[in-house]
Structure formats: structure tokens, C-alpha cells
């Protein structure tokens, strides 16, 4: 996949899954969890992404509820991708796209901060 093909691939995936992502955002809104206690929220998202072919790795940065979800539409082993975007076993460049979402709620208020919204893009 070239970098010029990256945006349409991501955009199409988001468009095709828009309703499901909005449902996940609503679920998180309806089940507010404060920082570092987002067990239902993170499980909801990770389970969904896993059904979509993402590989889930828990305990990102030593945070129990944090996870990294990795996906590729090529034959590249994503476990061998280095931060510079080079595959260890070849010289092929691959795009690496990062997305960070916070979905912790405020104590006693819930999601007045809107942290559930990044889930729906």
C-alpha cells in the first residue's frame, strides 16, 4: 500500500463502519468510567476492533485499560514494524497511522467533557 492509498483506505473503512462507531460512542456515554477505570469502555472498543481484524495488545504504557490495536491490509507482519515505518524483514516502507482516544469520564458528571466523541470520529 502506498501512502497515496492510505487515506482512501482509512476513510472508506470509517465510512463503512460509521453507524457501529457511533453506537460504541453512545455505549461509552451511557456507561461513564473515570480515568484508569474504563474497563467496560475499553473492552467494548477492543472487542469490536478485534471482530474487524485488528490485533489487540493490552496494558499499553503500563495502563491496565489501555490498548493498542494494529491492522494491516497487506502481507506485512505487523509485529515486526518499527517506529520509523520500516519492516524488519524488508526495505518496504509502510504507513503507520496513530489515533489516540481518551474516553474517561468526569467524576459525578459523566461525559460532560465529550471524551466519548473521538470513538465516533
PLM feature spans:
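Acidic/His- and Gly-rich active-site-bordering loop/insert found
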Residues: 2-120
Amino acid at each position: 500500500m502506498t501512502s497515496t492509498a492510505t487515506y482512501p483506505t482509512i476513510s472508506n473503512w470509517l465510512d463503512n463502519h460509521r453507524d457501529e462507531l457511533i453506537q460504541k460512542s453512545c455505549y461509552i456515554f451511557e456507561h461513564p468510567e473515570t480515568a484508569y477505570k474504563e474497563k467496560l469502555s475499553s473492552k467494548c472498543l477492543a472487542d469490536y476492533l478485534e471482530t474487524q481484524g485488528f490485533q489487540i495488545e493490552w496494558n499499553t504504557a503500563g495502563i491496565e485499560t489501555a490498548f493498542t490495536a494494529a491492522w494491516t491490509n497487506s502481507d506485512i507482519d505487523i509485529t515486526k514494524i518499527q517506529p520509523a515505518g520500516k519492516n524488519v524483514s524488508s526495505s518496504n516502507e509502510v504507513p503507520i497511522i496513530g489515533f489516540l482516544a481518551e474516553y474517561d469520564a468526569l467524576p459525578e458528571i459523566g461525559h460532560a467533557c465529550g471524551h466519548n466523541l473521538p470513538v465516533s470520529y
